[in-house]
Amino acid sequence: MSSYYNKGDAPSWEALDQDGLDDVIDTSEPSAVAEDPGNYQPGNYVFQTLRTINAEEMKRLVKLMQTAKEQYEAQDDDETVETTEPEILRKTFPPIEESHEMNIANVIQTCNFLFRDGGTQLRGNKRVFWITDNDMPPGMNNRQPARTSYGDLTTYGVTAETFFIDRPDHRFNPNIFWNDILDREAIDYNDDQPDPEGLSSLADLMKDLVIKTSPKRTHFHVPLKLGKDGEIVIGVSGCSMVSEQGKGASRYVKMRGQVVEEVQSKTEYTSAKSLNSGQWGSNPIKVLGFQAASQLRFQDNLKHPFFIYPNEEEYTGSTRTFAALLNSCLKYNRHALALCRLRSNHVPEFCVLIPQEEKTSSNGQEYPPGFHLIILPYKDSIRPPPKKVAEFLQSPPIATDEQINAMKAVIKRTRFKAAAYRPEIYPNPSLAYHYDQLQALAFEEDWDPEDPAKQALDKTMPLYGGMHSRAGEFMEEFNKEIENDERAVEKLAAPTKRGKAEKETTVNEWDLRNIPDMWKKGTLSQLSILARLRLRRRPFTGQNQKGGYHRRRIRTSFHK
């Protein structure tokens, strides 16, 4: 029996808020499939249609696989009995007779029907996981129906992920049938020792690519005004390019009773006068003018950017006008300066609209056409860097050639394997713990924070062992170069004891410059004569020739 596992709406276990899953088992007894007008191809057992995953269905699958595992392990205990298929799998998915086996195209057509029935509810990427150990499936002599069905599947935007399993006495050869059907190039096949693990590649994929992503949503629909006094108005929509993903909104639930129920909240509205107070009016994007690219500063990009594109729902012809504006900005290398209010009752903000040209490749569109909307900061929001940092940046110390070469060796051996940073494989540790706890609660499992598997949820922890094994000796060489540098040696002066007279002369110059204010506040007694003399740059020692002139003059100035 060959099994084909179909997982829709998520690539490589990339879980969405509404992840869809369905299971298709081929070469099953037709009588095991319920007779239904909407039924799929005969001989294919649809264990679960493509719909949102819930805890009850996952529990049913887990229980089925646990029972099958127990039955299979029970056969291993008796060496005199040959291991066979677990009874629960044969009962749940009864195999069809070899004389009634159907063409493999029926399985692909069933996948087509599943995605078709899912309709517009399917979001994100769509993939089919093919798991089989049969490199010569039924109907391989007539391949045209399978090619046609797979072509129809790709028109839905569905791709196939194959996991071919080696048998103990046979190595799987995809060149016989599957590479031809899936429109893949033939590989160099060698009849080596079969892989004893079988599903090792699938296990590695499940371990490394368990990713949770948030669905991409449009953040706002606003009008874009051009010309004098906004004579030209078009509709635009914007989506966030970078958005911080947080935990879901908390909800109150009623734990008592047979079923956990959500508590229904009641919302009360205030009077219309209270709601209308502080209204800022409509929320458009009004173009004020155009600037050259040299007017932009990198440090002014403080907030998350938005990407805007035309929206024809409110204003007809928005796409044509939007394209003309985009092409003009690209032609003259200009960006638009605008005043925007993206949400109702928000304070207006200045922004720039940076054009982006469409770029395509052999794989399709890489960069869509549109504008990047970047919020500009107000003057009060800008802070200068610390004085020491500014001085350091003006004249930074220059490393020697030996130090540079030593660090090059360290960087070369500690870089990413893919030579690029992939943020999708580094989930937020806090969210990873949160979702894992929710999963344990849904499946009624214990959650132990000391479990090594739970500690491994934090993918941001550096792999110190691998780093030191690859670049440990080069790190030591770099440290030696730094230690031998004379600039890294600091001479610490011995601390000196401060005398009583020196303590009395310590004063805050800012307080001395605000003596009239201190007199008004009644804190003038905190100052001393010596402190005042220090500010006036008068001598501290020596005999006063004019007899008390300083004391009288200072006292008089205190009361002014």
From Swiss-Prot:
Highest taxon, organism lineage: Eukaryota
Biased composition (Basic residues): 548-560
Any one of the GO CC terms: Ku70:Ku80 complex
Segments forming domain Ku: 224-413
Top enzyme class: hydrolase
Protein's cellular compartments: Nucleus; Chromosome, Telomere
SMART domains: Ku78
GO MF term (any one): damaged DNA binding
EC numbers: 3.6.4.12
Key words, A-Z: ATP-binding, Chromosome, DNA damage, DNA recombination, DNA repair, DNA-binding, Helicase, Hydrolase, Nucleotide-binding, Nucleus, Telomere
Gene3D superfamilies: 1.10.1600.10, 2.40.290.10, von Willebrand factor, type A domain (3.40.50.410)
Biological process (GO), any one: DNA recombination
Reaction(s) catalysed (UniProt annotation): ATP + H2O = ADP + phosphate + H(+)
Family to which this protein belongs: Belongs to the ku70 family.
Assembly and binders: Heterodimer of Ku70 and Ku80.
Name assigned to this protein: ATP-dependent DNA helicase II subunit 1
Organism of origin: Cryptococcus neoformans var. neoformans serotype D (strain B-3501A)
